Amino acid sequence: MAEGLTREVRMEVPDTAELLRRSEDISGAPEGERLILNMGPSHPSTHGVFQLLLELDGEVITKAIPEVGYLHRGDEKIAENMQYNQFVPYTDRLDYLAPLANNVVYACAVEKLLGWEIPARAQVIRVICSEMARISSHLMGLGAYAMDCGAVSVFLYTFTEREKIYLLIEELTGARFTTSYTRIGGLTRDLPPGWTEKLKDFIKQFLPKVDEIEGLLTKNKIFVDRTQDIGIISKEDAIDYGLTGPNLRGSGVDHDLRKKNPYLGYEKYDFEVPLGSVGDCFDRYMVRIEEMRQSCRILDQALADIPPGPIAVDEPRGYLPKKSAVLTKMEELIQHFIVVTQGVDVPPGEVYFGGENPKGELGFYIVSKGGGVPYRLKIRSPSFVNLSILPKILPGHLLSDVVAILGSLDFVMGECDR
């Protein structure tokens, strides 16, 4: 039987593979020595295929090593062999809890490289889609987080409201998860008749539900004890590790791309950016609660001012003509053939575009050598970056705190591993 690992040996462990090898048999480790615990890659609280290697001294964590990559699909390499519009469905599978928001950011990145400005109506509809995705993502994150911390009933409240949003998304896009709603230069279809009124009705009944959900958690002693002063991330650490989204703002850093670097006309909307003061799990929870209210505020303004007009740019090289025209006119038939076989003709150049997604800043860095296929596409995943701070904040906490800290970061492995 292998000998237990001493404190001195632990400090010399060079990498994850060595940790795994040396932790194969620790059942006979003498008292006072440390233990390696494999959490995952299949564990309920990770909400995805994610492994966390924990070094324990009793119940106290002394070292943490996140192990990612189990859900790697090679999305960036796939993009190099696909036309720009063909890659839209792959963005659904990044943060699959907010596919609409992924669609929007990717389309904006390609349009920035093309130098296109989409019509005002399409911009407003994209804002609506992004904020609906933010609400649905936060509902999922908060419900699962509460359940992980022992408040199972809250999960039922959040999922009931999330289902209402999915019904609206399904009516708009034709799908609940794999929406693929955007196209380079616009959208696949316009708003269905009566859809905006349904969304207004949802917002009206949803705001009291947010208060109800908050009431079930904010004054819940068990939830408060498990989240307050747990997993504290200072402003300096949040910035140094490149955190974005609610995890950054929960530490009190006022950074929101919708305010700092407005896109899609976000500068026209009146909304607040909620901030935390301590940077603990509770602050990150409160930021997401308030963000849902602010998203409803943005949606109200957007629904009140949806301009008429087209939903796509007037660029024949980038958009399919109407089917009726393809069947009757030679020019439209040729245009249809070129767009389908060659894709959008993007000029040579490189561009980065980042959008404020529910998990943080989702960015696309695209290099083009001309033509309809990118030379290189790099995805800036907020979940991947946010997970990088775990080795910093987990040591010193109890093993029971790990679940609360992981849930407060609200990561999704489809986007992290891509």
Curated annotation (Swiss-Prot):
Pfam families in alphabetical order: Complex1_49kDa (PF00346)
A Gene Ontology term for the protein's cellular component: plasma membrane
Catalytic activity: a quinone + NADH + 5 H(+)(in) = a quinol + NAD(+) + 4 H(+)(out)
A single GO molecular function term of this UniProt record: NADH:ubiquinone reductase (non-electrogenic) activity
Superkingdom, natural source: Bacteria
Principal location listed in the UniProt entry: membrane
Membrane topology designation: Peripheral membrane protein
Keywords: Cell inner membrane, Cell membrane, Membrane, NAD, Quinone, Translocase, Transport, Ubiquinone
Record-linked InterPro entries: NADH_Q_OxRdtase_suD (IPR001135), NDH1_su_D/H (IPR022885), NiFe-Hase_large (IPR029014)
EC number(s) per entry: 7.1.1.-
Localization terms from the record: Cell inner membrane
Catalytic EC class: translocase
Self-association state and partner proteins as the record states: NDH-1 is composed of 14 different subunits. Subunits NuoB, C, D, E, F, and G constitute the peripheral sector of the complex.
Family annotation (NCBIfam families): NuoD (TIGR01962), PRK06075.1 (NF004739)
Role, per record: NDH-1 shuttles electrons from NADH, via FMN and iron-sulfur (Fe-S) centers, to quinones in the respiratory chain. The immediate electron acceptor for the enzyme in this species is believed to be ubiquinone. Couples the redox reaction to proton translocation (for every two electrons transferred, four hydrogen ions are translocated across the cytoplasmic membrane), and thus conserves the redox energy in a proton gradient.
HAMAP family on file: NDH1_NuoD
Family indicated by similarity: Belongs to the complex I 49 kDa subunit family.
Protein name per UniProt: NADH-quinone oxidoreductase subunit D
Name of the gene encoding the protein in the UniProt record: nuoD
